[in-house]
Structures are given as C-alpha cells and as structure tokens.
Regions:
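Core helices of alpha-solenoid repeat scaffolds
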Residues: 5-9, 39-43, 73, 104-109, ...
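Structural detector for internal amphipathic alpha-helices that build alpha-solenoid repeat scaffolds
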Residues: 1-5, 14, 22-38, 44, ...
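Ankyrin-repeat and related helical/solenoid repeat scaffolds used for protein-protein interactions
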Residues: 144-195
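HEAT/HEAT-like alpha-solenoid repeats
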Residues: 10-20, 44-51, 55, 74-84, ...
Length: 210
C-alpha cells in the first residue's frame, strides 16, 4: 500500500474522489481522518464514500465521519433526507447513532418508528434505537431526554421486531431516569419473548443496583 504523503486538504479529498480501488479509498479516508479535516468538501467526499461498492470502504468512512463529529452531523442529516438509497441511509444512521448528537434526534426517531419492509431495515431500526440511547445519556436537554424515552418506550412495547424491543431495553437501561425505569418495568410485565424478557429483566436489575 502506497502511503499518502499529502498535507493539503484538497489533495486528500481529490485522492479519495479519484480512488480506483478499495485500498486506495481506505488509505485516503484514513488520511482525511488523521488530518482532522472538517471542510465541506472533505465531509462530502466521506459521505459519498458510504456508497462505495466495497463494504470495508463504507465502514472506514463511517468511522471517519464519527471521528470528525460534530462537524459532520448536519451534512449527514441532509444526505439522509435527500437520498432514496437504503444502503446509503443505513450507513448514515450508523454514523449518526454512534455520534449521538441532539440534532440527529428527529432522524433517528423517524427510523425507529417506520415499518419494516425487510431484515436490513429492521437492523437499521435497532441501530437507530441505540442512537437514541446515546443521545439520552449525553444531552443536557430534559425535553430531548423525555422524547427519547417516549420513542424508546414505544419501541419496547409496540413493534413485532424482537430485536428492536431488545435494543430499546438496552437504551432505556442506559438512560436510567425514573421514567425510563418505569418503562422497563412495564415492558417486563408484558414481554412474551424469552430472550427480550431476560434482557429487560437484566436492565431492571442493573438499574435497581445503582
């Protein structure tokens, strides 16, 4: 692998945009990430890399976008809203969920609350639910915390997707406010799936011990 020796941000972005192989693309992404470039062109190039046909490139781009946050958040939200590519949207949700920025709340809540058309979308919903948990434990805004708990409570009690209910239980455990604990107790009382019920029970027990 040829080491990139560019120091100019435009050169790094150009290298990524012109990458002819996954190896070249990953090297360029790593260079942008290491340089901590947060210029619009760099962020745009990283978001475009999420659509690369090689999964390792998209994964590297997600990691870079998370590292360069919060500067990347608005661009990620805009890209999500303007895209109809479910694959691209899934990677964007991964990034936003890991970042856990308040500004992504509406997008993550929307994803959690949409109907499942296939297994892939179901997985994205679970990632979004974990993102709401991240926001719930990092934000200083009581209203945002309340809305996160509301959406996670819905996700815990309503959907047929057991994986989403499981993810909601983990997120509510992390938030651990009285409201979140009450939601977990309700979930424990009504959950029929053994795996999910066990996870909710663990969440309730851990919260009681704190």
């Amino acid at each position: 692998m040829n080491k990139l020796k560019f120091t100019d941000s435009e050169q790094l972005v150009s290298q990524l945009n012109r990458s002819s192989s996954p190896t070249d693309a990953i090297s360029a992404i790593a260079a942008i990430s290491a340089s901590e470039i947060t210029e619009t062109a760099a962020i745009s190039a990283l978001i475009q890399a999420l659509s690369y046909h090689h999964a390792a490139v998209a994964t590297a781009a997600v990691e870079a976008l998370v590292k360069l946050a919060p500067a990347t958040v608005e661009a990620l939200i805009t890209a999500y809203r303007s895209s109809t590519d479910q694959g691209l949207q899934a990677y964007i949700i991964q990034a936003l969920a890991q970042i856990g920025d308040d500004r992504a709340f509406d997008v993550l809540a929307e994803v959690v609350g949409t109907a499942v058309a296939n297994h892939c979308q179901g997985n994205v919903r679970r990632i979004a639910a974990r993102g709401l948990g991240k926001i719930g434990i990092t934000t200083d805004n009581p209203e945002t915390i309340h809305h996160a708990i509301e959406k996670l409570t819905w996700a815990l009690l309503t959907p047929e997707d057991w994986g989403l209910r499981y993810a909601a239980a983990v997120s509510l455990q992390e938030i651990a406010t009285p409201e979140a604990k009450a939601a977990l107790q309700v979930g424990l009382n009504q959950e029929a799936d053994k795996v999910v019920r066990s996870r909710i029970s663990t969440s309730v027990e851990k919260n009681l011990s704190h």
